């Protein structure tokens, strides 16, 4: 019984993944998912209360992992003594982005759902929310540098948002455009070098 139950659940999730990837959450048909899974509507509702509950079951583990590791990286850095933060800046950022690239490459399809197919769900602003966190911690770090006597030019929150948004969306292109895993780390490493040089220029370094 348990084996049959697990098989039914897997069939529903596999059919849903294909349907959501093809049509997005809003365009996906619950009837088509049930049909493609080869189960009854009653069997479906034995596992999920709605189409959104099904989408959440597929996406949430990955959204949670990406956001929690991202927040951990931000708070770990911010909790360092201020005088130690500058020397850790590049290392912390590179390590986290390298982990993120590996993770999204290992979980391409559900991550692609999260990034490309979530309109109409609570996940549709996922990248925007990450960007807002990045902006907040960037502005805090600028404050740290100023307190240390660095002459950091004033930069608007909107500019910081544009820069951070460009960076995150560029990293996620790895999944959106099915970049080969062998190529992704190198491309993202060069992307980081590009953004690091830009930030250095803006900060007068």
Residue ranges and their predicted role:
Residues 1-4:
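N-terminal intrinsically disordered/low-complexity leader segments
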Residues 11, 15, 19-53, 57:
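Helix-turn-helix
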Residues 15-22, 65, 69-76, 110, ...:
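Solvent-exposed, amphipathic alpha-helical segments
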Residues 56-65, 126:
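Alpha-helical DNA-contacting segments of helix-turn-helix folds
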Residues 57, 71-103:
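Hydrophobic alpha-helical connector segments
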Residues 91, 99-103, 121-147, 158-165:
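Amphipathic alpha-helical packing segments from all-alpha helical-bundle domains
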Residues 106, 136-144, 157-205:
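C-terminal peripheral helix-coil segments that are non-catalytic and often amphipathic
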Residues 112-114:
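Short, hydrophobic secondary-structure boundary micro-motifs
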